[in-house]
Amino acid sequence: MISTYISKNDSNAIKGVAILFMLFFHLFNRVTDGVIDYWIVGQSFTKWLTPAAYPVPFFLMMSGYGLFFTYINGKLNVRSNLRRVLKLYIHYWLVMLIFVIIGCFIAPWHYPGSLETIFRNVTGVHCSYNYETWFLLPYVILCFLSPWIFSIMERIGSLSSLCLALLFSLGAQYCISRYVATGVITNPYIQLPLTTCGLLLSFVLGACMMIWSKSRFVVEKSRNHSLRKVYCVLLLIVLMALRCLIHLPWATIYTFLFILIYVNMPRYNCVDKVLMEFGKKSMVMWMVHTYFSIYLFHDFIYGFKYPVLIYLVLLFVSYFTSLLLMELASKLSMKIIRF
């Protein structure tokens, strides 16, 4: 009997989709001079597509799912979380060290900055070197809090947990839009708990997917039905089109539906293998890609002018850079993490 859980391979493939979305989102979510694109109703075609490519909820849901799986198997504790977080930070620090050194020559007015700036970036409190890593520390906080979060979820049930997480997230998002975005609150140490609470809904929903997946949501994939494949592809297209056209704060719902359709869709093995490979490298690709596309090598990346070429070049350099850095970080982790 085929497992009804989202497998590790499925999870890696979804992370692969998420990192492909992330590169697209960060490349084309802003207008850049010199890019040759089609314009529709006063907006570039690629900009129209970016709402469907918002990646953060994908990573949060897969993290919530995976950590809850670890929790119910009795392997989620302070020690395992400390190992997980330290490994994450070793990758983060290595990437930062290399690119900040490069930045000292290319953009000396920005790198390395004051001692306070260095401290905030090293800890992840305020990621001014590479703002797109903003959810690193909030994610770490959720990891450390996850045993208590999951314990509460077991006591009050999944639906009550979702309602509670929704209240926290809505409250945090209101405060962010009302006070942080307007500049009333500028202290990153005050912003941090708000940001963390704002991510809670996606994280808890991922854990709920683990609870529900046994019988309620994930269909067994025992046969490769061509008709089901067509239906799933059409559903994904419609869902993504709605996300692009309906500009409302429903990214979490969109991501949840996308994942449900995706894991129930019969897929080609070759496509899955490519996505899984990107998924395995997604952490470092996330950490490096905007150093190339925004902060240090912007003119080189966008110099290819056409969106497809720009995207492929960034994907290429981010992937192969991640191969090298992951190898170095792996060796460092083996020497540092000995518990």
Where are these regions (language model features)?
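Aromatic-anchored segments of alpha-helical transmembrane domains
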Residues: 20-28, 122, 165-179, 232-245, ...
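Alpha-helical transmembrane segments of multi-pass integral membrane proteins
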Residues: 101, 124, 235-339
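Interfacial loop-to-helix transition and helix-capping segments at the boundaries
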Residues: 44-56, 123-138, 176-205, 239-261, ...
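Alpha-helical transmembrane segments of multi-pass membrane proteins
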Residues: 21-34, 103-105
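Short, Lys/Arg-rich, polar N-terminal cytosolic tail immediately upstream
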Residues: 1-7
